[in-house]
Amino acid sequence: VHAWHQGYLRALRQRGGELRCNRELLSARYANDGGWTLQLSHGEVIQAAQLVNAAGAWADHVAERCGIRPVGLQPCRRTAFTFAVPEGVDVSRWPTVIGIDESFYFKPDAGQLLGSPANADPVEAQDVQPEELDIAIGVHHIEEHTTLAIRRPNHSWAGLRSFVSDGDLVIGSDARNPAFFW
């Protein structure tokens, strides 16, 4: 994933694009003859012909600040954890295993197994943390449906996945303003 991100960043820079980190978009205004004027935190003002909204769970908030109608994204927490491989077992070529009811999954990951309860719990956009109950549910499902025994997770985390009501992807130019890309 890191290599992919770096490749995208190289391509962005080669095409004259910039990545600005640790900035808050306060507001944005679009003028047909001049493109976007973005007001960022710390008094920074940026001009842009095209605005790409890659804010994930915060994408609707960004759209509103740009005068664009939100699409109704619902951020959902997903919990994951890693755990030890059974002693003497090479799992490097194991496939991803998903429960028939999609109540869990696990797969090889960097010499360990990565598991999840495959949850999608609706939350507000935020820096989410893993819930102990979600980890316990994931461990329970994996142990219940396999012969794996998980003594304890090595590491756990949570992230946000965002969905619209129909479950489809949101990608492409906005219907009302083609200079705003979802």
Language-model segments: what does each one mean?
Residues 1-11, 56-58, 134-141:
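Mid-domain beta-loop-alpha active-site segment that forms a flexible
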Residues 1-50:
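Helical element adjacent to the flavin cofactor pocket in flavoenzyme catalytic cores
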Residues 24, 58, 77, 102, ...:
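A generic "binding-loop/recognition-motif" signal
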Residues 30, 62-64, 125:
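Short glycine-/acidic-enriched loop or helix-start segments at secondary-structure transitions
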Residues 35-37, 45, 80, 103, ...:
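Structural motif
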Residues 44-95:
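Central helical "cap/lid" subdomain
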Residues 69-72, 85-179:
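Active-site lid/adjacent beta-loop-alpha segment flanking the redox-cofactor pocket in flavoenzymes
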